[in-house]
Amino acid sequence: MILPWLILIPFIGGLLCWLGERFGATLPRWIALLTMSLLLGIGLYLWANGDYTLAPAPGAEPAWALEYKVQWIQRFGISIHLALDGLSLLMILLTGLLGVLSVLCSWKEIQRHVGFFHLNLMWILGGVVGVFLALDLFLFFFFWEMMLVPMYFLIALWGHSSADGKKTRIYAATKFFIFTQASGLIMLVAILGLVLVNYNTTGVLTFNYSDLLKAELPAGVEYVLMLGFFIAFAVKLPVVPFHSWLPDAHAQAPTAGSVDLAGILLKTAAYGLLRFALPLFPNASAEFAPIAMTLGLIGIFYGAFLAFAQTDIKRLIAFSSVSHMGFVLIGIYSGSQQALQGAVIQMLAHGLSAAALFILSGQLYERLHTRDMRQMGGLWHRIAYLPAISLFFAAASLGLPGTGNFVGEFLILIGSFAHVPWITVIATTGLVFGSVYSLIMIHRAYFGPAKADTVLAGMDGRELIMVLGLAVLLIVLGVYPQPFLDTSAATMSGVQQWLGSAFTQLASAR
């Protein structure tokens, strides 16, 4: 019964934030902070007391650490079916942690309609948790689409204009909504197609994940349905050429919106590939894998090159996310257990490091009232602590040994090399470009000639706690990743078996 509460807690907390605004602007902030702290606490309890050696695998009835199922719309085979395994647990822990940080980083930034802001923030996070737990495909789609509306309001009502003043927050919010809504509708068509094909074969109308895993699909039909899922996840990840909504959304979003977008919402797409696209359509995924990995490779370099050209610090970080998610895509489709686990570590590490960089850019904006790096420079001695901490996270983002980013990228490249050596070698050179745009960001913002001589306010206790906590977690993930690898091992083993057997069949057919 605890699984429904993981979803309900953010929704209830959001309503309480909205209702609590009549008693002052401070109460909604504390309610939101307690709500996300409770979610994180329950996640840690489940991690400490759960058996995460159970996970779905081909040829066996899916087994889960925790499962909850009740009938919802019986006539159409729709149920409220939730389940938890190692992968979904790690994603929920990331959601809880970044949820706490998104509340803290908006503590002073958001001054208008504070209750409604936190209602939207909590409902985004509730929808994300629903995505990570839902096994009924209709329920999964419901939560997938439900995240969009509160994120639209978050950007449209509390966002900023672009640094050059040409793009408004309404433009960015609308572009985000259209991209993700259109791709979601494509996935809905694919879900309905899968359900109908299974119904024609078995005579059973169901949206249940376990039943649809057994669906017998003609090769051409499987490929088309897989593409429907892939496009939806590729837009959210994002994969080039479906990425253009991301820089605008990040640049115009409030800091909390950027933290949730980069840290959590992008990970729902990678999770969707691992949970649904590969296991439901293994043969089509194996056939499509070279194309997917090539798209990942393009994303690594395209994101890096566009990051070079940015003057808005948040747009630079956004394009770096496109580059980092290219490594995740290669790891997912490589068919290697090592690379798959590396993709999970990279998802966690990128969530932490990107969230920290967006929090730091938000703190810069509060002091300078600009995100344009051409108007910065010479800040190293003008702001206490912030430049040095920014340098650490920039180094972590480029894969500094001893941080989780290094472990994730190393495992992806080592695991992929045995299967796709030419893609891996080219992707490795992308790390060089990653170091260049990270150092460009630091040089433009903190070094060079100072634009003014005034000393700016240093970081206060709240700001230091947020980023130092993320730094410690990144180092723990880099120095001792074994607990995270053990937690996700069973799930990734199952995904590897689905994809590996499909690769074997594809090779023998040729």
Regions found by a protein language model. Give the residues of each.
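Juxtamembrane/interfacial segments at transmembrane-helix boundaries in multi-pass membrane proteins
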Residues: 49-79, 164-178, 184-243, 273, ...
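Alpha-helical transmembrane segments of multipass membrane proteins
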Residues: 14-19, 44, 103-104, 126-130, ...
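Central hydrophobic cores of alpha-helical transmembrane segments in multi-pass inner-membrane proteins
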Residues: 4-19, 35-46, 92-106, 124-125, ...
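Alpha-helical multi-pass transmembrane bundles of energy-transducing inner-membrane proteins
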Residues: 23-25, 119, 123, 127-217, ...
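Structural signature of hydrophobic alpha-helical transmembrane segments
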Residues: 1-9, 84-95, 138-150, 222-233, ...
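Alpha-helical transmembrane segments and their helix-start/interface "positive-inside/aromatic belt" motifs
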Residues: 25-37, 171-183, 386, 461-469
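Predominantly late transmembrane helices and immediately cytosolic-facing juxtamembrane segments
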Residues: 240, 354-357, 423-457
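Transmembrane helix-loop-helix hairpins at membrane boundaries of multipass inner-membrane proteins
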Residues: 1-2, 16-119, 206, 211
